Amino acid sequence: MKNLKKLIAVVSTFALVFSAMAVGFAATTPFTDVKDDAPYASAVARLYALNITNGVGDPKFGVDQPVTRAQMITFVNRMLGYEDLAEMAKSEKSAFKDVPQNHWAVGQINLAYKLGLAQGVGNGKFDPNSELRYAQALAFVLRALGFKDLDWPYGYLAKAQDLGLVHGLNLAYNGVIKRGDLALILDRALEVPMVKYVDGKEVLGEPLISKVATKAEYTVIATNAQDRSVEEGKVAVLDKDGKLTTINAGLVDFSEYLGKKVIVYSERFGDPVYVAEGDNDVVSFTEGQDSVGTTVYKNDDNKTAIKVDDNAYVLYNGYLTKVSKVTVKEGAEVTIINNNYLIVNGSYDNSTIVYNDVQSGDKYLNRDSNYELKGTVTVTGAVSKVTDIKANDYIYYGKQYDVNGNVVGTVIYVVRNQVTGTVTEKSVSGSTYKASIDNVSYTVADNNVWNQLEPGKKVTVILNKDNVIVGISSTTTTTAVNYAIFKEKSDPFTAWFAKVKLILPDAAEKVFDAVYSDVYDKVNLAEGTIVTYTVDANGKLNDIQRANDQPFSSASYKADAKVLTEGSTTYYITDNTVLLNNTSDGYKALKLTDLKDATNLNVKIVADNYNVAKVVVFNNASFVSTTTSTVYAYVTGTADVYVNGSTFTRLTVLENGQTKTYDANAQLATNYTHKAVVLTLTNAKIANIALPTVASGVKLTNIDQANLRITDTTNKGYLLDPNFIVVDTNGNLKGLSDITKDTGVNLYTNDVGKVFVIEIVQ
């Protein structure tokens, strides 16, 4: 008895409280009568993990069985961590005459009696096998939490309700409680702070779960969702000494605690079952200007600077990196936690109107390398898939970086917000441009957009996320119906005889009856003029207008990029572009796949405001199967191939980050293995091999991988191709981390002057 009293005194102490936040526990139990979607499933799972319950056997939890008084006392003792004490109390004489010494719960009942958790039912009896009532169960739980002097039964009922123990339960206070309902109450009680009384006042302590779970203090850094180097099922944390490590995540979602100090409570198998948030200094604001180094700026009148720890982690656009590796862009939403962890969302490098629907396999948005779809692409806003981004959407583009500053992903926020109406007013004040659409005033992004808005004209404008007009929507028409080439009109052309011959997008000639009164003054057109037209309900031509075409005499076409260029102007060709070739045998319809690389093209182009071609008419263009292209690559292997009595060389190369093979027309005399090369391809075969421009023996003083820039010792800067590689002279793939200030390198550049191969030479 003396030892028991001593132990009771020890386990009755309390600790300081931390503000707690509930964490759901997934429903994983061995019990066949507990379904994963049952309302009590997660509660039973945590009680089982903490060894508070082992079920009723067979293997079942007994969700619909009534709770007995002996079972309830056992639950309470185990929740308080008193299982060992109860085992010791078996040797004590039974406290109640109806609980024999060999009763399975005699130790539990003796201990509860000694601790004041149970007083029996009177006349020296405990009534261990009687069915427990709802209010009685609440009384046992509240006593375990340390509450005293509550009125029976409504004082207990009210306190349980205030603590959130009975949410969703609708039981009569004198009704029998079942094990499934009790599991909910016990599980909720685990997260309630225990109380003790000081000078008659309640003082909160640690949550009840602290009695049965081990605890440790951590700062949460990342899960696999924020850093793919973290193993699935683990979470990266800083321990109390500031050391980075990983622990099991268990069945707890740690994402809601990123950057915060927490107390992690773990069960008998070591997996977390509850997280209590510690004291954290949290400040949130909108970034007022681009960050400089490790200094960020509030969006207030003074652009208040906040210097964060040089080694601070930052969850930047959803991925973990270091603050020194990124620039927090103006307008981003910033949360700083304890001055050593930042959460930055909406940090965008660029924004733009989308000109073409995004297709599967597209490497860039708008075929612009500033909008490369690199790594894992996360799309939010109006759509959630990159292939759901459409022409006339407005997008914000940002990147994700790892802790070394490498780009690992792309983030895109999509705004699909257009307003159609009449321009009713325009104004300008200093550098602020305004326009009203149907008398609703909008700010206009710039002078170029503002100049396109004509009062009295109906338009569809594109808005950004701040409801600013950023462009005019290109109108989508059915090209097969609306565009044609004027061939001729009838002679005579009168009210009694009015016909017009047009060449349609499929190159077929069609003669239309015309509504003379509608078109008589519009058909004085030269043969070959590109026009738009409409017909009435009877199929008669009732309008014809010359399209605004642009003639070019020396255009070039690039098949891989699907672009037609003349000088500095680029036009984008799509599957919807009407393509015709005017040959000596008449007009021929072309498909996009018919177009090959070509130069010195004589063309007429009709395009929208974004240079997306609606109609392209070539004049005697020759698109044959012969295509010539240039490839900048690094040769990883060379093989001589013998086929049907002939021999040719096959090169295996790294091109734009991908392994490819190219065949020469004959056997090559030179071995190009482990060399950077320029391949001229004709019909996808090697016609010529040259060596690219190289800067030899360079040493680097700065490597800015985030912005794809490097600087040598002469302070000369080089831009890196997005798909650059680093190798040594033996062809082994390396990384930028292998280059120090004393490392000599050769820099091989492509046709636009960007470094595509860095070769380490020492």
Curated annotation (Swiss-Prot):
Domain called SLH: residue spans: 27-90, 92-155, 156-204
GO cellular component: extracellular region; S-layer
Subcellular location: Secreted, Cell wall, S-layer
Alphabetical UniProt keywords: Cell wall, Glycoprotein, Repeat, S-layer, Secreted, Signal
Name of the featured protein: Cell surface protein
UniProt signal peptide: 1-26
Pfam families on file: SLH
Gene source species: Thermoanaerobacter kivui
Domain of life: Bacteria
Post-translational modification (record): Glycosylated; contains 8% carbohydrates, which correspond to about 40 to 50 sugar molecules per monomer. O-linked glycans consist of Glc, GalNAc and GlcNAc.
Entry-listed glycosylation sites: Y297, Y516, Y520, Y632
Main function: The S-layer is a paracrystalline mono-layered assembly of proteins which coat the surface of bacteria.
InterPro entries the UniProt entry points to: SLH_dom (IPR001119)
